[in-house]
């Protein structure tokens, strides 16, 4: 009887100890590389919401709109939707450059000529109060040309990577171009924006200057 009690006690302690041991087994070894975003949730953005941004841009004559701005630990990721209409020749001083934020374009529809290069002619500081500077892509400059720039004919399905400090300049748009933009913000210079803020923005006309 005494032996049976001992066996039962051992089994009980083994049973309650196993979950703890299993938990220890899945814990990250503190000497291993650690996640740079601790217990961070993923983010999903449905295509229907992105399409609402494009329709809003067309209806309200907007160009660049921020859909999300997400903290991923050591950086933030912005998701933007951009709609540009027909452009026969570039506007004056329309070269853009961002000091701290890199951008990735995924072209959804349309086609355009995009010039890229770091040597910007007649560099002019963007006002720090501009909405795009404050909320979208941080401080940067405009310019009148890109010295030695390379012109790319971009179309639906193409991807463009624009490092911080690289000038980018639309010189011709056949009819329109729509693209999704990923903004990489390692210095966290732009404010966060979640789903609730996005849906609220979409529910009413954009304020003047947006």
Q: Where in the sequence are the language-model features?
A:
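Short, conserved beta-strand element in jelly-roll/cupin
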Residues: 99-118, 128-142
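His/acidic/aromatic-lined binding-pocket segments of jelly-roll/cupin-type domains
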Residues: 96, 102-106, 151-152, 159-160
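A short, N-terminal "cap"/entry segment at the start of jelly-roll beta-barrel domains
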Residues: 22-98, 192-200, 204-210
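N-terminal secretory signal peptides that target proteins for export/translocation
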Residues: 1-4
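Conserved metal-binding segment of the jelly-roll/cupin
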Residues: 153-174
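Bacterial N-terminal signal peptides
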Residues: 7-20
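A short hydrophobic beta-strand segment most commonly corresponding to one strand
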Residues: 175-191
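Short alpha-helix capping/helix-loop boundary micro-motifs
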Residues: 144-149
